[in-house]
């Protein structure tokens, strides 16, 4: 009764129980709460299409594994994929998300202009969003999962140059899809 403010409890008993809860550093079990509430949650992931062995494959597999674990907690994860080299594909995926009004969105912000438009709509609808792999800090995502690009580049260069002889040539290759 004290935990959930249900029913009458004397002030003396309430204070005694609250003191014990504080001493024990009591935290409610979010899984039990989710199961008891019977509310269903839907989260959407927006990731690039991928095949085994490609960069995004392990991320997709992680989402698949998490979705299986969360299913018993009334949490449904819907995955939407787009062609990472095609802005139209990304825009179509955004439109799909906006028609569904999920409880949250995890997305790879590959195209900045379209991502900005999506996050603006999500904010209007009070739908939280999280970025993965790339961060667009001015869009104020709830969270970001990925590397710190500057620090990663700095470390890579430092390791590359660690045993570098003064006469060595270094080549850097970067692929672009056309």
Predicted feature residues:
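Short beta-strand->loop
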Residues: 46, 171-178
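Short, well-structured alpha-helical segments in soluble
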Residues: 87-103
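Periplasmic-binding protein-like
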Residues: 98-109, 128-132, 169-174
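Amphipathic helical "hinge" segments at domain boundaries
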Residues: 28-88
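Hydrophobic alpha-helical segments within soluble ligand-binding/sensing domains
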Residues: 144-171
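Flexible loop/hinge segments that line or gate small-molecule binding clefts
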Residues: 110-152
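N-terminal helix-turn-helix DNA-binding module of bacterial transcription factors
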Residues: 1-38
């Amino acid at each position: 009764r004290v935990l959930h403010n249900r029913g009458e409890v004397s002030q003396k008993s309430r204070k005694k129980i609250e003191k014990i809860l504080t001493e024990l550093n009591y935290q409610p079990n979010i899984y039990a709460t989710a199961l008891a509430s019977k509310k269903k949650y839907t989260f959407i992931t927006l990731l690039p299409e991928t095949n085994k062995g490609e960069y995004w494959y392990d991320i997709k597999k992680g989402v698949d594994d998490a979705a299986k674990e969360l299913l018993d907690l009334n949490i449904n994860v819907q995955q939407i994929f787009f062609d990472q080299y095609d802005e139209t594909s990304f825009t179509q995926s955004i439109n799909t998300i906006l028609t569904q009004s999920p409880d949250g969105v995890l997305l790879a912000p590959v195209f900045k202009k379209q991502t900005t438009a999506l996050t603006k709509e999500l904010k209007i609808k009070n739908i939280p969003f999280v970025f993965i792999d790339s961060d667009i800090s001015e869009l104020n995502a709830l969270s970001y999962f990925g590397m710190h690009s500057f620090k990663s580049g700095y470390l890579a260069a430092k390791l590359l140059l660690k045993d570098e002889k003064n006469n060595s040539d270094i080549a850097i290759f970067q692929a672009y899809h056309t």
